[in-house]
């Protein structure tokens, strides 16, 4: 599927996709080296490249929330989830997290941490 999609891309959009792909190895290196602020900046660069792929990647509400987050401490982020919204994953330095969480009080905050086991999702359910 990905190969078919890339073949249909214009040369400009193809360059955007390849820039994003190149970010993968750099992102891994930055995380492993503990260069998390640079990782946050790279997330921002990747998000900006992804938005260039098409108008349906984002919308005004998402852009406003993302820009607000950058102005209030986030260094970068990206939209995750299926079309029509999803959620923003933001990198915010530890010393700025509480400020941003307070500023985004009308949104849902889901804390996360890195796991050595790969991707994990934990559900807490209360049974009545």
Identify the function of each model-found stretch.
Residues 85:
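Glycine-rich active-site/cofactor-binding loop and its immediate structural neighborhood
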């Amino acid at each position: 599927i990905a190969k078919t999609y890339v073949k249909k891309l214009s040369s400009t959009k193809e360059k955007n996709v390849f820039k994003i792909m190149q970010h993968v190895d750099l992102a891994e290196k930055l995380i492993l080296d503990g260069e998390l602020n640079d990782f946050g900046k790279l997330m921002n660069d990747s998000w900006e490249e992804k938005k260039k792929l098409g108008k349906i990647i984002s919308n005004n509400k998402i852009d406003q929330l993302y820009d607000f987050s950058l102005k209030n401490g986030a260094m970068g982020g990206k939209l995750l989830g299926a079309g029509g919204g999803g959620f923003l994953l933001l990198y915010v330095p530890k010393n700025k997290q509480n400020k941003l969480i307070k500023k985004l009080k009308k949104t849902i905050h889901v804390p996360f941490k890195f796991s050595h086991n790969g991707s994990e999702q934990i559900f807490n359910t209360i049974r009545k």
